[in-house]
A protein has these predicted regions:
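ABC ATPase nucleotide-binding domain signature region
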Residues: 27-95, 190
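Walker B catalytic motif
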Residues: 137-141, 145-148
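Helical segment within the ABC ATPase nucleotide-binding domain
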Residues: 150-163
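Conserved structural motif at the start of ABC-family nucleotide-binding domains
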Residues: 14-17
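ABC-family P-loop ATPase nucleotide-binding domains
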Residues: 3-9, 66-123, 127, 131, ...
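Conserved hydrophobic segment flanking the Walker A/P-loop of ABC-type ATPase nucleotide-binding domains
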Residues: 21-22
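Conserved H-loop
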Residues: 165-171, 174-181
Length: 204
């Protein structure tokens, strides 16, 4: 996907002439302070119209989005049942839960409100990954997790996305999350523009 845009929030230009190309299957981290424009950038990728320029996401791509501060209704069904409803395959549902670190058989029967904050964060990921997205957008990834948990979740998510060929764009201001994700591209968002830093060589 690729774009070149200008976007405003309440008459203040958040992004000016921003240009970025993201190869399919890449892991990209948007870094920057709160209010720098990371959420605006994700919303543009999600389909919000820019004030100028264009955002080009290949047609037919499945896009999944985890918002930042807003709580998402995770339902009342046991977590294994909830993932199974999306995949229609018990084995595949168990595999997805295992990959995000929810591998305890007791947890399979737990309902979302019975989970810890970190477990709910991982369950949200499991639900979206069960939709088999081509592009996964996450705002303020792992914002409410302690450092060790944030690292574990980031490591697991990065590995899962690489294995499944999912393009990931995650916004964060936490350096330990950036290090754990080990992205292909680090994009600093601020001062109305973007600064890109490649971090990985070609994949083998």
């Amino acid at each position: 996907l690729a774009f070149g845009v200008k976007a405003r929030v309440v008459e203040r230009a958040v992004l000016r002439g921003a240009s970025l190309e993201i190869p399919p299957g890449s892991l990209v981290v948007l870094a920057g302070e709160n209010g720098a424009g990371k959420t605006t950038l994700l919303r543009l990728l999600l389909g919000e119209a820019p004030d100028a320029g264009e955002v080009a996401v290949p047609p037919g791509r499945r896009v999944a989005y985890i918002p930042g501060e807003r709580e998402v209704d995770l339902g009342e069904a046991p977590i294994l049942e909830a993932v199974y409803r999306r995949l229609k395959d018990v084995g595949a549902a168990i595999e997805v839960l295992n990959r995000v670190g929810l591998s305890d058989a007791v947890l399979y029967r737990a309902r979302p409100h019975e989970l810890s904050t970190g477990q709910r964060e991982r369950f949200r990921l499991a639900l979206l990954l069960a939709e088999r997205p081509d592009l996964l957008l996450i705002d303020e990834f792992a914002a409410h997790l302690d450092v060790p948990t944030a690292r574990r979740v980031a490591l697991g998510l990065g590995k899962l996305c690489r294995e499944a060929g999912v393009t990931l764009v995650a916004a964060t201001h936490r350096p330990e999350v950036v290090a754990a994700l080990d992205p292909d591209l680090l994009v600093y968002v601020g001062y109305g523009g973007l600064t890109t830093v490649p971090r990985r060589g070609p994949r083998t």
